[in-house]
């Protein structure tokens, strides 16, 4: 019951605020701080200190001391208590890191006045409150003093400073103000003088005059003035309230309750100083807090309302909660700098002092001399720092387990966070809130920051840990001089009482060591440096100051001496007599120590303390019962809180208390005797435990302490009774010893004996242990489970082990049940062996063997005769396994295991069953080899694989390999059926029912993954190639032969989109339209063009307005600048523009070739002949249908028998514009309309030429071969001339020949007849001219041969051969030529078995099929005087060379090259012919459109017989 109550209350306490887990590396460290002491420093003072003081004892800690701090403290407690304090030096290298973020850590400081009288600013704060209350009672309200130098004025310091130089009540003149400013260390300015004068005249002077005795006597004679509110007589007689609890604000009665008067008026309606709302035009509102002030009430006053934002002093300086005790907010770096400034200021005051190379003695003397000067001619020095701030409200400098769990020093025993919670610390045995003692306190101070004389709370020990910075000097008095020192303090400072000493654990006063020595005290001095500890004993007064910027952390601790020496009891008695609350209950600590059963507390002194406490409690209850015999006594429930305090002595009532109902209060039993009005009706007695329960607890505790002797007697009695005692009796004695936590030698010996006995018994149990007959589930086939079951005897133990252990049991010094069980097991084993030997005399069968082995398993031991039975049983089981053999279920591994088991079981090799099993294994291996050999081939035979599958049905083969074979066959059959279905569907008469090309592509991809190649797959591939050839044909129509196959569908979508706008039948002819972004402009006759508001379309593309628009000056049609590839930067406002419709010479930018409508119709017509449906069919149909409908729409206008008149010119322009914007070419209509427009409205000097094709104007991309050349040039494999060959002299001569060709062509075109007023050339004449020109081009002329010989090279280019060049030899003349010079590449060269050069080909009368590209840039036309008569080489037949057509025919049959084969070779080199003498990136097909050049490719693109055959192929 007692334990449950205490631990319930303990666990219900809060765990504190949650802390964020951090890493030590996240903090910023300042480099100039000291974190460790230097033990070799000569400045360590041991003797000859100032004032003749002796230095305190220093102890060097070792490694063992660092692991158990309380053991060290208990061992050295006498020394600590005798000296009052000692200093501890940790080992070298031991240092707890500072976890403060030294760059961002910020704290609110506490101001300190370096003065003997008082260190803190309590008097200043009290004076300010009295002054404020005095003026508020007279209607002058203010919340903070005026501001000087960004700091509020300290009224008390100002009053003391003025009183030094003048009498109270007198006025201030300039001389006095000057002295006061110097005394207060202020800047002597006019504004400062005005503020000081107003503060004195307005605030201090009236208060001091009213507080003077003469003024009080005069006021008592006068009548009491009338005031609005009703006050008590005591308040009227005392004009100055003594405490802040008395409110000077006027009150009124509202609904029967007292309330303040001022809140009845909202803030901002009356002045904060005078409390009046008069003269509202002079009231100024603060833009921060909306407070109102009269401009005349401000200090200093304002003459007018400021126009800009105005803030009161409370908002400007953040002093709405003014408290002179509070300092600024500091960071470590700024406080260190301020400390240096203060030290320099003190040096300037005493010019004789040297501030450089000061020792600690010099600084100590300097401190006391500065303190003496503060009481003379200078004002006391103001210091700031942090004194004993709880780390629960501010960050600690020590790592804790909650915030830094990964830091090793977080668990260090000497870490102040862990010290109060160590097991020996008595703070763990109090169930009250001891956070004021267990939470560490951080102190940070600048130079000379002082910690006044104080002692630890509740007579506990105190531990200081210097964290970083300069030295802190401490003065300590022994504990036996504490009482005398308290009397000395009270006599020296009568304003303080003994209650002040005990309430604050000291006074904020400074007593110099010299004064202490003069009065008979014996102080010691200790210099605490970084990383050092200072242990202060209980009841020892100590005082310290900082010799520079430094910081230390402190915490309380309590050892067993806290109770043993009566320190806690005496401390609580003192607090009780002074009615000062205490946080610890002496009774709760005693009971908690008793219930803990800690061996550290198992002493006679705790028994005496516990018995004395019970005696006092019993005496107090008996006294109460005598005074009030009929008083009701109730036992407290466990839910009643432990913190119940006495109303008189303010101490916690833990064991019992008296409660009064009216008025309700609690009184302890000790104070209850002093109550006069004790009666049974209004008082009740409550207790947690009665005397009987406490007595039982004391008896158990006494038995716990005195139990070891009793237990030893019991052990001796058991050992003397029997030489071999029972082991369970010894174990029972050991359990009792462990419950009592005994540590006697007998207990240790018995524990070792029992442990050895238990280990021996474990070995006996392991020997007697029988393996379980339940076996785990096995994945093996059933036919092998029986064999493994009887073949595995590893779980059976050897019987010799049992008899050996039985022999060792005779030497054991105890008896137990396990020894008897072992004897019985040995008897059973001997009996089983006899029965096993008798079974050999008769016949053995399978059942008999199984029964004997089962009995052996039950016993758990094996004997030599058991192996014979096991061998017989295994052979029986193997035969059963063979009979249960099935080929469909058994794998090759099972068959191999069967053979292995048979050999291990002793089955002869000539046994019929063994011979059959090995034969099956051999057949399985042959089958497996055949399968692997078949699968390793690139083309697998389906029939052979089917035979292997059927053969495996009667063999024991690898099931995975068999499944693979079956899977291949199933997939092949599935794909075969799928291909057959596709081929069957391809013969459908309805083209819509034929399969799509995607289905075919998917089927071919699936077939490629299989190693089986069937004839149906080859057939389907050929049909698929037909569709691909149709797609390539469509690509060539649009000039995209080198593009991927998918480009046809994409481009057809683009064509369909463009044609749907340009060839739209909804677009009807009409007058020119004006863009919406432009005003209407007149036409050539001054008429305004019609401008539609919506649906206006322009340009060839017949799309709405977009971007920059250009107007034609002839037809006034608007065009998109981007359609004409015109940049806005190159256009001028006054520039005139003629569209390509009006002037055919203006080029229209084309992104791709425009095929003829007839070619697209033919392409669409051939779709019906394809076996599969291309994806582009529907789009092609839409394009052809739209163009056909548009052509029918123009039939009437194009075939008008009366010709074109001027009235129909806009109509002709309209249709021609639509045709030019389309992506297909209407050849007849386009030529007709261009000729008619030129005839009616001629702009160009010559009529437009007849066009038969529409090529792209876009600069072509480099081909694959050209990209390879660029890469080889970049890598240095080819010279730069391969890309841009230099001009030669032959290139200059070429211009004359070109001009001759142009003249000849032009003369023929001019002589052509005219039809319908249009200059149309005869196509037949044109073709004939091209053929004649091609026939006149000969390479075998003597001039060309001579030029080659002059170059001393066999190639056309005349250049020398390099090792990197690719070359080929002619089979006739044996000349050597470069690949690129004769128009070859690697693919062509590999396909040609015999090569005939261009010269030999020309001499034999043949046509060289490839384009010549000499490296020197020479064009064949550049060579004059080509021979027209060619001698035929008798070695050559009708063909120039033979072609190895291995890439086109699988039979690889060599045949003679004919004109039809040229197309195939031309396709091999498609897109790689380069024009001579031009840039290497310009393909010949684009250069052929130029009017100034003519080449072989030009002739190949005309409609002669050769090109017709080429295009058809």
Swiss-Prot record:
Gene name? lid2
Q: Where is the ARID domain?
A: 121-212
Q: Where is the composition biased (Basic residues)?
A: 1257-1268
Q: Where are the zinc fingers (PHD-type)?
A: 268-318, 1093-1145, 1352-1403
Q: What is the lineage of its organism?
A: Eukaryota, Fungi, Dikarya, Ascomycota, Taphrinomycotina
Q: Tell me where it resides.
A: Nucleus
Q: Where is the JmjN domain?
A: 56-97
Segments carrying the region annotation (Disordered) are: 211-253, 1063-1086, 1244-1268, 1280-1327
Q: Which residues form the JmjC domain?
A: 408-574
**Gene Ontology molecular function terms on file:** chromatin binding; DNA binding; histone H3K4me/H3K4me2/H3K4me3 demethylase activity; zinc ion binding
Residue spans, zinc finger RING-type: 1096-1143, 1354-1401
- Could you list this entry's UniProt keywords, alphabetically sorted: DNA-binding, Metal-binding, Nucleus, Phosphoprotein, Repeat, Transcription, Transcription regulation, Zinc, Zinc-finger
**What protein name applies here?**
Lid2 complex component lid2
Regions that span the bilayer = none
Spell out the Basic and acidic residues composition-biased ranges.
1076-1086, 1301-1313
Q: Which SUPFAM superfamilies match?
A: ARID-like (SSF46774), Clavaminate synthase-like (SSF51197), FYVE/PHD zinc finger (SSF57903)
Native organism is Schizosaccharomyces pombe (strain 972 / ATCC 24843)
- Subunit organization: Component of the Lid2 complex composed of ash2, jmj3, lid2, sdc1 and snt2.
